[in-house]
Amino acid sequence: MIDIVITYVNENDIEWKDNFNYWKDKEIKEGKADPNNRQAFGKERIRQWDFLKYWFRGIENNCSWVNKVFLIVQNEKQVPEWLNKDYEKLKIVYHEDFIPKELLPTFNAMTIGMYFPNIKELSNYFIVCDDDYFFLRPIAIDRFFKYGKPVHLDNKMEYKIYNGGYLTGTDNVFYKVLNNTLKFEYKITNQKIKYGFYHLPVAHSKEFDLSILNKYKNEIIKCDSYSKFRNEHNLCPELYTDLLKIYNKATLGNPYRHSCYCNLNSDIDFNYFNDKDMVCFNDTERLDNFELTKKKLIDYLDNKFPNKSKFEKEE
């Protein structure tokens, strides 16, 4: 059985927004958060595109092999009204169900992703998605799992490498998080992995991830305790997939063929993606016209997936 885990935030939930702003102001005053950290506070991080229903339609149309979809939200009020909560293939999971209590509430995708292995009922084989990762054409199971292992790109590298194998030349918080992760991997394995963050669906083994989480739980929770928001002290969930490769627990291949990553903008011709299997439609601070781009994207997705899925209420 193969499950999919997807995270979702409803920015229009006033209670959630008030809570977000409370912790943001508190941590800025305490010096724990940088108000200029766009990785935590940029409007593009949680801007509402209203395309989640099309994500579910893509799953139903193109990933018939999926056992269940685990929708991760902070609490019950974050669940979309149109969602068919009684559908047997849908499992709604709240942060309190799998994240350590001392870290709650959290608004940090890094923290949330690190604790996915704690989710009860989750199958051993699962795929992690964001809500902007779309399956546009039929996908076979062996794209993600082959020979009993998750499929990942081969990005193992030699010990002596340029700049020690770390990302340089930027103060971007996310790059610092990636470097933290690379350094931690080297510390515990004496091996290095190339920068390998792919903003597309990623295959996991719950059994393996849980073994790593349990073994290094003190180090991981320490990294996540500093702030409620993404910050330079975090590790990222790519820790699990990098270690899969280091410990030879992955099948090496290319799950991302005929797929791409797109930074959204108003001048994009979405028909370009008609022959793509998977696409990440990524929001950025450089987006020039949100409303126009949103309309064009929704029109494209509605044309691609015009029929409701069983994940949606009938009425």
Feature annotation, model-predicted:
Residues 239-315:
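Long, low-complexity C-terminal extensions of enzymes
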Residues 32-43, 47, 77-122:
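Active-site-proximal specificity loops/subdomain of glycosyltransferases
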Residues 151-231:
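Long, charge-rich alpha-helical interaction segments
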Residues 1, 11-44, 154, 160, ...:
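A solvent-exposed, charged loop/short amphipathic helix patch at secondary-structure junctions
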Residues 48-60:
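Short, well-formed alpha-helical segments that are part of the catalytic scaffolds
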Residues 3-6, 59, 68-71:
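Hydrophobic targeting segments
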Residues 26, 58-66:
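Short, acidic, metal-binding catalytic loop of nucleotide-sugar glycosyltransferases
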Residues 77-78, 115-160:
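GT-A fold catalytic core of metal-dependent nucleotide-sugar glycosyltransferases
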